[in-house]
């Protein structure tokens, strides 16, 4: 389970937080030292970090400094997302900070052609496509710019078709479940894996219990866990589990 679960650290204004359904006005701040958290997370193979300021187009040097410090202390692989929309920022994280993979969200939804070029330049192992979607009349519609707005693409499956055979890693978030501790959307992930079996899928949103994680193990490749790590004491339980 330690190899399946990817702990998440969300940074806003230099602080560790969790949002509720992507709402920046509903941020819970966790009074925990980054060093202490990273020490605990070293029990896991992977780590997911989000620069929430970057996700909504804001600069925050505090966040980038924290990410660089985490890289020095975390022993496993790290992926970073939030506002990564150009080659310069990708090279900064991959080459200067030595991050293992970058997560592209808004860019991969708004500009497929440019994203494909990036995948070919850096390799599919280095690029994670993050598609955050919301259920609108039983159709999962991608949202962009830190979940603040919808885009022209009206169906996640139409978007995935464009990357089929090109991209390898997906991070799929059901926004309505994010931060709610209501369980992952197994049905959505099952549909994606059935239609596009070549994608490596990371599930995100709503994961709150060990049972949630076990259910997701049947339909996805990884599960990103954020709020439940802090509030449901999952960290200790998973950390002592079998890989």
Model region roles, listed by residue range:
Residues 46-65, 173-181:
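Glycine-rich, proline-tolerant flexible connector loops at the mouths of alpha/beta enzymes
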Residues 78-101, 187-223:
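Catalytic cores of alpha/beta
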Residues 92, 96-114, 176, 205-209, ...:
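Glycine-rich phosphate-binding active-site loops on the catalytic face of alpha/beta enzymes
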Residues 4-8, 46-48, 77-79, 100-103, ...:
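Structural preference for beta-strand elements that scaffold enzyme active sites
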Residues 58-79, 120-130, 183-209:
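Alpha-helix-loop-beta-strand connector modules within alpha/beta enzyme cores
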Residues 12-26, 99-178:
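Conserved anion-binding
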Residues 60-122:
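Glycine/small-residue-rich loop that forms an oxyanion/phosphate-binding "nest" at active or ligand-binding sites
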Residues 23-41:
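Short catalytic helix/loop segments, enriched in acidic residues and glycine
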């Amino acid at each position: 389970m330690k190899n399946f679960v990817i702990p998440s650290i969300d940074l806003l204004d230099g602080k560790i937080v969790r949002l509720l359904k992507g709402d920046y006005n509903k941020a819970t701040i966790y009074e925990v030292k980054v060093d202490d958290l990273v020490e605990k997370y070293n029990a896991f193979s992977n780590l997911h970090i989000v620069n929430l300021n970057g996700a909504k187009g804001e600069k925050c040097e505090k966040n980038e400094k924290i990410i660089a410090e985490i890289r020095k202390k975390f022993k496993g692989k790290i992926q970073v997302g939030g506002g990564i929309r150009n080659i310069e920022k990708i090279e900064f994280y991959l080459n200067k900070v030595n991050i293992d993979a970058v997560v592209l969200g808004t860019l991969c939804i708004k500009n497929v052609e440019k994203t494909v070029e990036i995948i070919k330049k850096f390799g599919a192992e280095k690029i994670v496509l993050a598609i955050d979607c919301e259920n609108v009349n039983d159709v999962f519609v991608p949202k962009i710019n830190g979940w603040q707005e919808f885009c022209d693409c009206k169906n996640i499956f139409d978007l995935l078709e464009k990357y089929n055979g090109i991209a390898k890693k997906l991070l799929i978030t059901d926004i309505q479940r994010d931060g709610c501790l209501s369980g992952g959307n197994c049905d959505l992930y099952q549909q994606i894996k059935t239609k596009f079996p070549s994608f490596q899928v990371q599930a995100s949103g709503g994961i709150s219990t060990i049972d949630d994680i076990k259910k997701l193990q049947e339909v996805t490749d990884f599960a990103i866990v954020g709020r439940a790590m802090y509030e449901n004491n999952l960290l200790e339980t998973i950390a002592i589990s079998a890989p």
